[in-house]
């Protein structure tokens, strides 16, 4: 039995009347240390405390571990079939744990949530097995692929905004070449960057979202499928047959490449949210004019790609899950569901948006970002409002597959392997390791 009113304790949570009185255990990794400067963890702890204060008859037992320790401990508990009442489920464990009966099927519960219409459905992908949902995606998401460009430099080149097609980027190269600067800076020295910060989004432009979901589900999709090979072919073309990138893209890291942009030696840079925060902070302190000219854009669309031209890869790696054993006590289950819905709901999303310019599962309208500078506001809109989401490849499947693909990608980007060979090796690793 639930009747809702609002209580404000550090932040607003729905104060639902819960019949349960007793212990409820939650295990998570948002330590006090983790929450220092980490908006997602701070928001999680803040809303969790507000929910706890709103329900004095429930004894909320928190088991809080550092992230690395959490991953080890939760795996140990899962192996012993001794998971806590409520815990954070990592996406890559969903399929196996669902098959083992370790996590509750929350499909109907999630669809009955009072916040369901506000949920960003794209975030549920890692926590699906077939059509079933096993968790409420939690904490905050950050993009892995953003084009950061100097609006003034591109204006001088004849573009009011960053080009929406690679063809126009290639045309702009001629202008920037005459200026003695690179068109776009990129660093793949660590081998993972070409996957996380480029192919994961470019691939979506060719394959669409269902293909990668099928790959996750072992539903028949293959790395050797024509659409994915086309994405590899375009990647090789852009890096080996055009001159739009810095020559040393395969030997320098993203940290090196972003310095080319900061120094003005490149007119744009492609990287992730971690690069954006560094670039913005550095330029804000050192070059206010260049800081104010920061612009954000999605990857340009290839000429032969037919899928969503506005996609960028962003996701939430964990979800709030519930131990099926909790269902033995319906009142306790209602409390666990209420907790899961509140720590991922509008109270959390509003808090992280207004305090950190971040977003979570629940979309929030009319967020007041006025206290943030324009660049921060623009990046919030890029990340959560103005673009569509696709998956971060290496958040799924397993590292053995991506180690093979990443190594071969780097070789391909040196012109020493064909896209077909890369695809065949990736498929072989997939079949052997997943």
Region spans (language model):
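Conserved N-terminal structural module of periplasmic/extracytoplasmic solute-binding proteins
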Residues: 1-99, 115, 421, 425-434
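Short helix-initiation/N-cap motifs at beta->coil->alpha
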Residues: 64-73, 166-170, 247-262
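Short, solvent-exposed loop/beta-turn-alpha elements that line the ligand-binding surface or hinge
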Residues: 107-119, 205-230, 282-289, 301-311, ...
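Extracytoplasmic/periplasmic solute-binding protein
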Residues: 129-140, 145, 170-220
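Glycine-centered hinge/linker elements that transmit conformational signals in sensory
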Residues: 173, 217-249
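C-terminal capping/gating helix-and-loop segments adjacent to ligand/active sites or protein-protein/ligand interfaces
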Residues: 217, 314, 355-365, 377-434
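Hinge/lid segment of periplasmic solute-binding proteins
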Residues: 12-16, 66, 91-146, 170, ...
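Extracytoplasmic/periplasmic substrate-recognition and gating elements
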Residues: 53, 157, 241-242, 284-356
């Amino acid at each position: 039995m639930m009747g809702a009113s609002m209580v404000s304790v550090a932040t607003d949570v729905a104060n639902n009347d819960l019949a349960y009185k007793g212990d409820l255990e939650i295990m998570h990794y948002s330590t006090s240390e983790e929450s220092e400067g980490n908006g997602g963890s701070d928001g999680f702890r803040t809303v969790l405390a507000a929910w706890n204060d709103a329900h004095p008859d429930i004894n909320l037992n928190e088991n809080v571990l550092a992230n690395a320790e959490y991953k080890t401990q939760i795996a140990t508990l899962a192996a012993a079939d001794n998971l806590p009442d409520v815990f954070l489920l990592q996406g890559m464990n969903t399929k196996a744990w669902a098959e083992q009966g370790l996590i509750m099927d929350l499909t109907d519960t999630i669809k009955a949530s009072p916040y369901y219409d506000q949920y960003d459905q794209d975030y549920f992908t890692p926590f699906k097995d077939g059509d079933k949902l096993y968790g409420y995606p939690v904490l905050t998401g950050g993009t892995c692929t953003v084009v950061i460009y100097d609006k003034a430099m591109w204006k001088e080149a004849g573009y009011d905004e960053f080009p929406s097609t690679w063809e126009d980027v290639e045309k702009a190269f001629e202008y920037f070449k005459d200026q003695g600067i690179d068109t776009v800076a990129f660093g793949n020295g660590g081998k993972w960057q070409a996957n996380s910060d480029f192919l994961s989004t470019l691939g979506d432009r060719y394959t669409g979202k269902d293909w990668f979901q099928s790959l996750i589900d072992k539903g028949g999709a293959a790395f050797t499928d024509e659409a994915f090979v086309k994405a590899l072919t375009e990647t090789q073309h852009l890096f080996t047959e055009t001159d739009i990138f810095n020559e040393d893209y395969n030997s320098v890291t993203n940290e090196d490449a972003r310095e080319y942009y900061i120094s003005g030696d490149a007119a744009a840079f492609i990287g992730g949210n971690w690069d954006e925060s560094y670039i913005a902070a550095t330029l804000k302190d050192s070059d206010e004019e260049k800081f104010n000219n920061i612009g954000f854009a999605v990857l340009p669309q290839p000429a032969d790609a037919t899928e969503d031209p506005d996609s960028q890869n962003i996701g939430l790696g964990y979800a709030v899950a519930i131990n099926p054993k909790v269902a033995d006590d319906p009142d306790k289950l209602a409390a666990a569901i209420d907790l899961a819905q509140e720590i991922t709901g509008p109270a959390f999303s509003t808090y992280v948006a207004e305090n950190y310019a971040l977003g979570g599962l629940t979309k929030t309208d009319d967020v007041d970002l006025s206290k943030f500078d324009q660049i921060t506001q623009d990046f919030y809109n890029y990340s959560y409002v103005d673009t569509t989401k696709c998956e971060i490849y290496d958040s799924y499947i397993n590292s053995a597959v991506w180690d093979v693909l990443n190594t071969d990608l780097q070789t391909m980007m040196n012109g020493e392997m064909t896209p077909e060979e890369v695809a065949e090796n990736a498929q072989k690793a997939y079949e052997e390791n997943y």
